[in-house]
């Protein structure tokens, strides 16, 4: 049976080595996030201040996988 995961939105607050980030979720919980393989292969840049979607396991709610970088509303592209 496949493990159930929750998907949350949050804000990148700090960048760490090896594709790890501190993410502040919309409910103000800090969580340690790592970049998914699809984002890593696509060379998508994630910087502090970006909004992301993060997938969190029900068994370990302190870590999550960043699965999508949301577009900024004020960008010109």
UniProtKB/Swiss-Prot annotation:
Protein family according to the UniProt entry: Belongs to the IF-1 family.
Domain S1-like: 1-71
Protein's UniProt name: Translation initiation factor IF-1, chloroplastic
Keyword rRNA-binding: yes
Keyword Plastid: yes
Role, per record: One of the essential components for the initiation of protein synthesis. Stabilizes the binding of IF-2 and IF-3 on the 30S subunit to which N-formylmethionyl-tRNA(fMet) subsequently binds. Helps modulate mRNA selection, yielding the 30S pre-initiation complex (PIC). Upon addition of the 50S ribosomal subunit IF-1, IF-2 and IF-3 are released leaving the mature 70S translation initiation complex.
Gene behind the chain: infA
Disulfide-bond pairs as recorded: none
Organism in which the protein naturally occurs: Spinacia oleracea
Location in the cell: Plastid, Chloroplast
